[in-house]
Amino acid sequence: MPDGCDNQRGREGCENRPKQMQGVLRVREGMSVRGANRYGLSFEGIIQLLGGDDEARKAVALLRKHFRRGKIPKDELDVETALTLDYFRLALPVSSFHDSLSWKMRFFAIEDMEVPYIVRFFIEDVERGIGDWKATVERYFRAIGEERAEDFVKIFEEMVERSKNLIICGEDIVDISMKYGRDGGVVIAEMKGAGLISPTVGCGAFGRAKAPLYEINRFFAMLLEKQG
């Protein structure tokens, strides 16, 4: 099992993580060392999506180096690169307030950074020459044992469409999930486990302070905007 279970998903649900996840992130023989793509986004394309600067280039290099382990060591980070990784939700500081799963509740400091599972899967796919976010989402949810994994692509698309500044109400996620015959609570839990959403605080523009709110992964929302 990849490192970081307690920090990324919290204690809840970690014990029940499907065995299919084990060993999924392996280096394949013949993998392109430059990440040239058969289709979709290349590593150079990711760098440009992140701003095309030195920090973006270093962030991508660190993700390529450490995605299999799932953690980027603090001694390989500088402040600017860590901020880039954090802003795009490509990696998050391991420490957090009160063991919270919320990205916004994490301490920000130069420390080890954890790579969400969905980002690990995407980097692996780009290494294989398949830089397509939809293919990554489908592969991830198949790996954890979900049937009709393509549903999660459509659910994520609708979540982004309904969100305001990448914040979506839990009630909206439940409504979207029901359209595909899925339990909203299960979808939320699995989306959190993937790293596609995180609990957040405040009611924002929704005006429903009692409703749980979730932040959508910025990088994957950008991939959706770019690739459709």
Curated annotation (Swiss-Prot):
Residues 1-20 are annotated as: Disordered. It comes from the Archaea. Residues 1-18 have a biased composition (Basic and acidic residues). This is Uncharacterized protein AF_2141. It comes from Archaeoglobus fulgidus (strain ATCC 49558 / DSM 4304 / JCM 9628 / NBRC 100126 / VC-16).
